[in-house]
Amino acid sequence: GARLASWMPDLRGDSRPVQPTPRALLAALHRDVVGPIAVAGRVPLDAVAAPRPAGTAPVEGGPGPAPDGEALTARLEGLTRLIGLSGAPALVRAAAVHGEMVTVRPFLVGNAAVGRLLVRHLITRDGLEPTGVAVPDQYAARMPAAYADAAAAYASGTHDGVVAWVVWQAEAILVGIQEAQAVCRTVLAGTTAAG
């Protein structure tokens, strides 16, 4: 997302940009992801950066039924608390936030994409991958069946299912770091060509 880069730390110093509140972060990333398709008329404009209203099912599928009503409100509150929780292990927080986005689907559309952007933001903000160069969403694109299986495991709510999801997320971050290293080597070697 366009806003994501503005929240990343300065690589040459100790300055840290002011971070948005968890609700503002969710809204901004959702606006970045869904805004263009709303402008094209594919999604109602009032669905952009706003949680789904009670009684409205998400358009996109996911692992099992999405919560609604009070259950949706409670899970969304838990998600925002998790994003803002200080001192949580970076990998576990990123995995849980992503898992909640895919499982709860708090928005009408764009939940998985926002979840993947949140991973990138959180691992950078929390120092797991402080450069912000990693592209952990590559793994989901390359291995969609494994992504779906891991999401279903998380949605099961079992200990083993959640562990499987965290392991999948760790693999995704590792693949994203390897992809970033390959891009950096290409740039350093001067082997990129425009257009």
Language model: regions and residue ranges:
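FIC/Doc superfamily catalytic core
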Residues: 1-195
